[in-house]
Amino acid sequence: MTQEEQIRLYRLMEKLNWFFHQEMHYLDRETAEKTARECYPEIRNFTYDILWNDLPKEVQEQFTDEEESL
């Protein structure tokens, strides 16, 4: 992971921590929708591209096998 990606991930985690830290944030529909719209593209990118590509092949295969058994 590049330093730029690490910074992006840190900022994403900060935003998610802010959101989940106070129950009033996720109980407020407008705040929840805004946070979801802002965060989901980064979550998807990190999950399926950045972090996935950093995993060793054997770990990727393990996750793939687990998904197939669901």
Model-predicted segments: where are they?
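Charged/polar positions within long, soluble alpha-helices
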Residues: W18-H21, H25, Y48-P56
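Short intrinsically disordered terminal tails
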Residues: M1-E4, D54-L70
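N-terminal acidic leader/helix
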Residues: M1-E30
